[in-house]
Amino acid sequence: KTKADEAAVLIYTSGTTGQPKGALIPHRALIGNLSGFVCSQNWFGFDGVRNESSDAVFWSPADWAWTGGLMDALLPTLYFGRPIVGWNGRFSPELAFSLLQQHGVTHSFLFPTALKAMMKAYPHPRQQFSLQLRAMMSAGEAVGDAVFAYCRDELGVLVNEMFGQTEINYIVGNCSRYWPAKPGSMGKGYPGHRVQVIDDDGRECPVGVPGDVAVHRFDVHGDPDPIFFLGYWKNEAATRAKYTGDWCRTGDVAVRDADGY
């Protein structure tokens, strides 16, 4: 019988700070991703009062061979028993809007680069396409004011930015339904995770003091956080270097404000 802590998939990191490393992702990681997914998709069609099930339809151009496509799109959508639109072809703004319209897509994950291309090709898309969008997540780079305004005014959604990485995905972001986005911020720690800004010694930095974004091995309930990867494939030294005590470092520098952003 498969166990939660057994490896499910080997995903290589992007290698932005060195050679790509193979991160072993366990089966339990899907559960660890769900709170961020639900928040970034504005509850993904679940009302909590009027409806007990979701009617969401998901689409993203993110490839299903990496963390973004698997953990931010495909697997969470299937976990909730909802359809996800698949397309094996090159992205284009026309294709994107055609798929959104044809399949009545309600929720999506779109990169800022894709949104910029869509904005350039179709400044006023609802003049040509019937859109049913209710929520959208974006990640990979800063969305920026122009794209944020385009999503709000032309697509009819407040885009939720998200931050994570292959090893510990979906840890910080926004949820326009329950907390507003702040300019220049990537959001708050998603429910369940202990996310902090720490110094070189693993101590939590005071408000406004720069440090490394990190996630604690144990969640807010004191249980092992299921979001964590198992380690790097055949690279124990790199796995050890990822941690300071029970904190797993992202390698990204940030500051925290008094409201937790």
Tell me the role of every PLM-derived stretch.
Residues A7, T13-T16, F58, L100, ...:
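Conserved S/T- and glycine-rich ATP-binding loop of Class I adenylate-forming
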